[in-house]
Amino acid sequence: MQPIMPAVGGGRQRLLGLYHALGEDIQATYIGSYDWPGELFRDQQLSPGLREIIVPLTVAHHEAARAAAESVEGRVVIDCMFSRQAHLSPEYLRVAREYMAHADVVVFSHPWAFPPLEADLKPEQLVVYDSQNVESILRTDLHGELASADDVLRVVVADEYALCRRADLILACSHEDREAFARLFKLDIEKMRVVPNGIFAFSHAVPDFESRCQAKSNLGLPGKPVALFVGSNYAPNNDAARFIANDLAKALPSVHFAIVGGCGAALAGMVVPDNVHVLGQLDELIKQQWLTAADVALNPLTQGSGTSIKMFDFMAAGLPVIATGAGARGIIRTGTRAFATVPLARTGAAVESLVTDDEVRRLMGAAGRKLVEDFYAWERISPRAGRLFQAFLRRKLEGVRTFTVLVPSYERPDHLERLFQCLVNQQERDFDVVVIDQSREPWAGRDRDWGFTLTYVHTPVRGAVKARNAGGELATGRIIAFTDDDCEPTPGWLAAARACFQSSSVIGVEGRVESDHMDTPDWRPVSNVGFAGLGFMTANLFAANAAFQHLNGFDLMFDEPHFREDTDFGWRLQELGEVPYCEDALVFHPAHRRDSERESSETRSRFFEKDAILYKKHPARYMTIFHAEGHWHQTEGFWSNFERGAAKYNVDITPLLERFRDVSFGS
């Protein structure tokens, strides 16, 4: 209901960020309007791939919207009632229909325009609902206490339900929203994907040490520790501003606290300490100076919903962030600490510790920047969305495949070539392939005709867990078949797995993995023979697509370095249904020489830090694999790295240490 530009507010920022660069061969046209009167028609190119056309609503439409608002005590409901009032703006509908007629993909960024345009959709068009919220829940929260709003809320729920049922693809901002949609409207989660909000992370470089010192001098704070908070005039932000001024600043007089944005109005009339700088709204240049000068950023919220976008701004600037649980809600956590989460009462101690520890600030700031680049940069989210549209459009036009074979790859082009020859030889032909290649150079075979559909993504984002989740996002087959780039599936691999899925109770399949050099110390064999149902290996694992989406993929805490993510996933998969072991779904995994850096015993033993997370999540099941594998008394370095992981991830392993540590092989 609003124009994209100027991109102020979360909704407009999402429209600009998400659609500005879907792909070199994808042109997006946004048809919008103004939710206020008196504006003119507008048509402009916002980026090479995004055009904005804004059609004003009529005077009659605005009068009807005002009447609707009066019926609900003056609350603005022009968006909620659009489907019932759109006929009053025929020019908007005409322009929308004109551009819809030539589109392959039609996206509704809210449910409001869907009902009046539903009849104009073509059967072959991909229909997408880009949900910025679960509107049925949000609007009920906003207006549910008003009896006079019942009719408005019925319209909202009816419109959103109709769009969700018609959509071929639903984009949700979070996994929690995805689950809410599935639960509320009884939807197939297989057609839903999480596409988060973000920021333009690459628009500013991370300041170096000299730049930070210069910025402090420019602001009159040379050599002083600076903590920064940014917030609009919104109740949770206002509470945070008062907490900083009344509590933190008084407890830490040597630290200067900068409060930026409309939340500063909450401090009007108060006498604040000298080390509090209430700055109000700043232009972008001055705001960047404070981001550069700060040593630490704060987000001490105690309430709120959704993701706090300011966290991404802080991390993109390379700032270490101290947040409460509410302040960090919904943000991905990997195996590297990208921000600190503390209770409100411990915020002061965390600030005091962080401003005096240059190395921790440097490491956390770098990790936060990397997190934003990997997951929350519009520059990467937009092409991801474009690939999603292409994958689901192909699914709609060509039909749903039985399998999507998912392959992460990193610097093994020759192995990848051998794997593809094995896929060419598969007896089962109803499959497509997704490769997420994190190598420095693209794979030479990416454009070859292999006899099956290949989606190839070359990405600078590193990490096997990230790669598998990225591939799972693009997977449109009913079953996702996981294997590795150095594996060699036998010709009957997919066919054998398909037979297992004939049972409706089967949600996944664990295939047999054989290796060579099984008893040679200079080699690391990879096999699950004799370990059925215990560890699981993504070298040969199948999962129903719906189950993968329901589980939100692999847990990224097992990344950096990646280890045990497949075990955790397999165990969670078993909670949804049966995951039998299939001898005939066979993959050969060549052993790796120990003299390479990636495969050395010292390098591999460091991965046992992830056992701490596995133990924390699945304490009873962990003990089964603990004893079956026997690393605790056979593998040098197990205990030292397990203990390191326990400290790193805050896991209490005292019972294991007391019972097993002294009788083990050693650390």
Task: Name what the model sees in each region.
Residues 480:
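Short aromatic/hydrophobic "clamp" motif used to bind/position activated sugar donors
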Residues 14, 196-272, 278-288, 292:
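Conserved catalytic-core segment of nucleotide-activated headgroup transferases in glycan assembly
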Residues 488, 492-521, 590:
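Conserved donor NDP-sugar-binding/catalytic core segment of glycosyltransferases
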Residues 541-543, 547-552, 559-586, 591:
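A short, conserved alpha-helix in the catalytic core of glycosyltransferases
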Residues 459-475:
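Glycine-rich, basic loop-to-helix element that forms the pyrophosphate-binding segment
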Residues 132, 579-667:
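Active-site-adjacent helix/loop segment of glycosyltransferases
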Residues 394-425:
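N-proximal low-complexity "stem/linker" segments adjacent to membrane-targeting elements
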Residues 420-458:
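Acidic donor-binding segment of Leloir-type glycosyltransferases
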